[in-house]
Amino acid sequence: MMNRFTIAFVALVGSIAMLSCCGKDEKSDSPDPDSLAVQTDRKPFHTSDPLTGRTPSTTVSSDKMALYFFGWGEDKDYIFHLDFPEKRHDRVIIAYTMTSVLEGPASYDNTTMLFVRNKADGQWYEIARAFTPFGNAFTSSWSKTFWIDVTEYAGMLTGDTEFRLYYGGFDATAARSHAVKLDFKLYEGKSSEEVVWTAKVYDSSRDGNSGYRAWSYGVEGYDIEDDTRLGRRTFTLPADVKSVLMKVSISGHGHDQGKFTERYDYETNNAAEFDENTYTVIINDVAQKNTGRIFYSNRNNYQQAGTYFYDRANWAPGNPLNVQYWTITPPQDTRQLSIDLNLEKFESQFTDPKTEGCAQYIVEVDLFGYR
């Protein structure tokens, strides 16, 4: 039989245990400072319709647009407009069709970037990036469609909407040219999440120093980690933003045989197109546990001419970009969010960032705040 002292002692221990458990639960709601950013397993694109069986309420389509070199600056990009319904949609999927004009696609694997103007802030956001195939062996009947989920841009896709198209190749001829056709599939419904805030973190297409909308990598005096490039950026989050999606679009280009200074006994493999890299995400001056990898296996790429089966830095000939998505938990004690991305250290073999073959990265990083 328990006496009063024993009963009191048991009650005290139970109370302490309950308080301890409560403390743990409370603490678990707030991630550690080095775990605020976590990469998700969201697919960058699909090779078949991810919403098969569900009918879009509206499809907004572009004409088939031939791809040729429009010019060096953003003001030379191909401009077009599409008219969307005025209401917001639950899901938005682009059916991105690679095709051709005249006798078939052009020869090479070049960068294509699609930008949309956000009416709210007037800025251009890269909604999709893709790479043309080695098209020599394809005829005029060839085409290939990919499906890209762009639901986070739904708020920008209302009414008369302006787009810019960039193509980084010079391979169009009088007989052959790559082309692209876009079908925006809009699905009605009430989303459980709503984007209430957007911001740009990095955009190399605005001030690329390589000549190709990219930032050179490892060239002395043109550090990609400079404040004007991949430097620290600070944002004030609106009070109603509960979570943040970070979209990281990085593709490597060039065939530079420089040196990764922190890799022991390593032989560079034509950076930055054919050599992999990693990046560290720094949130509010704290390096995150998860690191990003700039690499894409082309082992299962479909057959083309050329080096379509060689692994590359986040991309494959004839495919959309290997975009990476991160969720960021805003710090609990402040509405200030700073972001910094650090690549591995590299010393280029070149001294001029515009030298053909110089290692370079095309970079766009955007934030989407959810209520």
What are these regions (language model features)?
Residues 3, 23-26:
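Short, intrinsically disordered low-complexity segments
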Residues 1-9:
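Bacterial N-terminal signal peptides that target proteins for export
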Residues 11-14:
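Core hydrophobic alpha-helical transmembrane segments of single-pass membrane proteins
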Residues 26-371:
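Extracellular/secretory-pathway and virion-surface proteins
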Residues 17-21:
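C-terminal motif of bacterial Sec signal peptides marking the signal peptidase cleavage site
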